Amino acid sequence: MAIIGERLKTLRLEKKPTQREIAEAVHITEVSYQRYEYGSVRPSLDTLIALADYFDVSLDYLVGRSDDPRRLP
């Protein structure tokens, strides 16, 4: 679970949105997003997909199954 939080934080810091902006974009609360980033709660599959879409990375990258963030066409 920690890998998801680490990846979320890295992506957020690279792209510069606030936690609130991300949460609003994927229709979750800011507190929920913070918990995902801190690794204290695991996001649902729907939320993981929304986050991967938001950051334009593959779901495999977000969950740690790949080190390549690119999405396959």
Where are these regions (language model features)?
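Short, basic-rich loop-to-helix N-cap that marks the start of a DNA-contacting helix
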Residues: 40-50, 71
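Conserved hydrophobic/aromatic packing and binding residues within compact polymer-binding modules
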Residues: 8, 22-23, 33-36, 62
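Short, charged recognition helix plus adjacent turn
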Residues: 2, 63-73
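Short amphipathic helical patch at the helix-1/turn junction of helix-turn-helix
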Residues: 2, 13-14, 42
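Short basic helix-loop element that most often maps to the first helix and adjoining turn
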Residues: 6-25, 50
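Recognition helix of helix-turn-helix/homeodomain-like DNA-binding domains
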Residues: 27-42
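DNA major-groove recognition helix of helix-turn-helix
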Residues: 37, 55, 66
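DNA major-groove recognition helix of helix-turn-helix/homeodomain DNA-binding modules
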Residues: 27, 46-61
